[in-house]
């Protein structure tokens, strides 16, 4: 009970910290992505014709419910969406706390450091733009699904609740919540289910109960099938959508662009990985292109190696799933954003919540490896002779130094970013207060000011402000 309290306390404090931050760094004003949403869905947010469209899954159905509640009860207040984002972020932190409760190898200090990184302000752009709450909810949903899968694998699928959740979570997440963000999630799940099925198939004769082995394989198959079904539904819906990429500077294929300038893609990935450790502004101060800094991407490979070398996957697959998800998310962002031909595009704060899965997985891996090393150090010499890891002492020391160095760098980088964002918060709020005044005076404001401060086409801004004014919503409430 005491451990649960200690594990839950950082989650609550992190939520309260983010609520404090958004009220000091943001304001209730519809701008940027909100302009498109206002013009598309308001004021008749309950109109079925706007809901039942061929590309409904790309529009994320759960956002319709959130929009209805916001308009009907809160007058379309952007703080409502931001609070949803904070609570969604807290849900992911709660999943990490649940995992730490189940896996006592994660020490409390390691857990605190992970929570500190998790609640850092490197995600400020996503959290202060209320429309991003569904992305945060999606990531937390993925964390929950991975935690359920980890528990099911560790307990041989003995819990009915685990089996049911593994069957229905892909449908709930992909169809209702996470459609646009579910590509990497689905790939990692299918790889995990395939590996688990093969492991059970190969080791079935050695298990204490063959019936449980068959039940596990059936659970993995059902989970994989529902994942494929959910993705087929989403991809069909996505095929009906029409996308407009504002700011895209090329129309050639990714293969042609890679052949023309392969180093661009490498720089894109390296800078994106670096941004998940240290904030964008701080990276620019440190000149992220330096040879020392780009080596950060090797930590992903180190984490994968450690999961295999110490056979952590036999006890828990959760950290490995997170590491793979983080790496996959980097590739997906590259695949979606390379068309802008800006190698710093992947460093945007809006993607940090997706990258952070990998960082959390790396830190969890290090925590578990550190626990294994500590246990071996406490064994008797006779036990060491039977179970020791074959690395030499120098190699083990080097490994510990590398893990400690990355952990310190990650904590320091996120602390630096958070400190800088706390100092910047009043200026961000002041900027949005100017945006609010321009929105209130949209009829007389210049096109340049509307585009600069409300981050959208001036005509679209005026149309959106007119809708809000006529219905007494948002800044006109």
Predicted segments, located by residue:
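Specific aromatic-rich, kink-prone transmembrane helix
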Residues: 113, 134-157, 190, 358-361
């Amino acid at each position: 009970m005491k451990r649960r309290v200690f594990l839950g306390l950082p989650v609550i404090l992190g939520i309260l910290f983010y609520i404090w931050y958004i009220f000091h760094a943001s304001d209730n004003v519809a701008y940027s992505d909100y302009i498109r949403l206002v013009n598309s869905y308001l004021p008749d947010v309950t109109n079925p014709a706007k809901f039942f469209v061929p590309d409904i899954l790309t529009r994320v159905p759960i956002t319709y419910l959130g929009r209805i509640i916001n308009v009907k009860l809160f007058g379309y207040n952007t703080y409502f969406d931001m609070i949803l984002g904070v609570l969604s972020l807290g849900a992911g932190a709660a999943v990490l706390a649940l995992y730490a409760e189940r896996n006592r190898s994660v020490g409390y200090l390691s857990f605190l450091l992970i929570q500190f990184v998790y609640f850092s302000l490197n995600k400020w752009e996503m959290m202060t733009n209320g429309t991003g709450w569904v992305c945060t909810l999606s990531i937390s949903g993925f964390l929950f699904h991975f935690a359920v899968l980890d528990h099911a694998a560790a307990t041989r699928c003995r819990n009915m609740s685990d089996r049911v959740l593994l069957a229905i979570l892909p449908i709930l997440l992909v169809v209702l919540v996470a459609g646009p963000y579910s590509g990497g999630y689905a790939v990692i799940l299918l790889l995990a289910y395939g590996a688990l099925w093969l492991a059970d198939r190969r080791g079935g004769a050695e298990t204490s109960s063959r019936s449980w082995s068959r039940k596990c394989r059936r659970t993995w198959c059902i989970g994989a099938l529902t994942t494929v079904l959910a993705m087929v539904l989403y991809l069909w819906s996505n095929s009906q959508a029409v996308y407009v990429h504002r700011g895209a500077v090329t129309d050639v294929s990714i293969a042609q662009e890679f052949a023309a300038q392969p180093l661009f893609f490498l720089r894109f990935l390296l800078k994106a990985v670096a941004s998940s450790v240290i904030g964008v502004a701080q990276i620019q101060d440190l000149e992220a292109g330096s040879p020392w800094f780009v080596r950060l991407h090797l930590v992903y490979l180190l984490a994968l190696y450690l999961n295999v070398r110490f056979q952590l996957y036999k006890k828990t697959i959760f950290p490995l799933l997170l590491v793979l998800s983080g790496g996959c998310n980097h590739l997906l962002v590259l695949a979606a954003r390379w068309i802008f031909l800006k190698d710093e595009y992947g460093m945007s704060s809006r993607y940090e919540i997706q990258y952070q899965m990998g960082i959390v997985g790396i830190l969890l891996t290090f925590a578990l490896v550190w626990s294994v090393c500590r246990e071996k150090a406490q064994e008797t010499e006779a036990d060491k002779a039977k179970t020791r890891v074959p690395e030499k002492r120098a190699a083990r020391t080097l490994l510990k130094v590398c893990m400690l160095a990355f952990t310190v760098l990650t904590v320091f980088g996120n602390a630096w970013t958070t400190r800088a964002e706390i100092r910047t918060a009043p200026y961000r709020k002041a900027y949005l207060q100017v945006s609010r005044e321009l929105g209130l005076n949209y009829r007389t404001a210049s096109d340049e000011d509307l585009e600069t401060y409300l981050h959208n086409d001036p005509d679209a801004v005026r149309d959106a402000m007119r809708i809000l004014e006529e219905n007494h919503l948002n800044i006109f409430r």
